[in-house]
Amino acid sequence: MNKPFAFENLNIVIPKRKSNSHKGINGRVLIIAGSNGLGGAGIMASEATLYSGAGLVSLYTHESNVKASLIRNPEVMTLGISEFFQISEKFNVILYGPGMQKDEWSNKMLEHLHNLPKESKLIIDAGGLQHIKDQNRTISNEIILTPHPGEASNLLGISISEIQKNREETAKIISEKFNASCVILKGNKTVIYLNQSKEIYICENGGPELSTGGTGDVLSGVIAALLGQNLSIHEASLLGVAVHAKAGEIYANKYGEISLNATALIPIIRKLLKK
């Protein structure tokens, strides 16, 4: 049975911070994103993570993107990666894929998905989805996949029109095929499929204002921050999708549907999460 949900009706609360809390316990998020020439995706994702409450945000990206990231958000610990690196166990959430393409640098980054800290939750978005399709090894961590219809079409080898005819079943099939704990199939009335409970949720917020580049990067960053603050995959997925879509509605009501740029969502999301 499909369960509709909206931001206005969710009863999901980010845990209140204790008076003696510190940055290390409020979410330690690593974002691996941004091939050469696609640095904006990693910058947007990391900014969304930062402004959604994560205590520590690190961005591992192509060396060419480091300067822009540090100018935009000096709070994000940005590292230019060219060779093998070790992923520390300090990260409890890892987001992989925004701004990744099929190139040598991205292929090097892919190798690390099979050597993650066991407790780290993993979000795979955008170019990362192509990478998991192309490799045969199973990733043992809890995974959230966040495809749009085009990416879902590529994952399953069927047409976008077939995807759109049965979005709920598509999300379920992707989850089963790639052993994902959760699949978020983006688009009009975003679908969330939870593998463990077999529940399907359909978001009633949002509209065509979100159909612009970068909004998916912002969404994945928000969800990463919520996971880092000890929400479950279920809670972080529902709240992340709903607050992102509601932010789009608020922007469209004020400025119209056609002028939204993805980073304009971030300050609105910041205010909504305060509630």
Q: Where is each model-derived feature located?
A:
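Small-residue (G/A/S/T)-rich helix-start motifs and N-terminal tracts that mark the onset
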Residues: M1-K121, Q130-I144, S153-K275
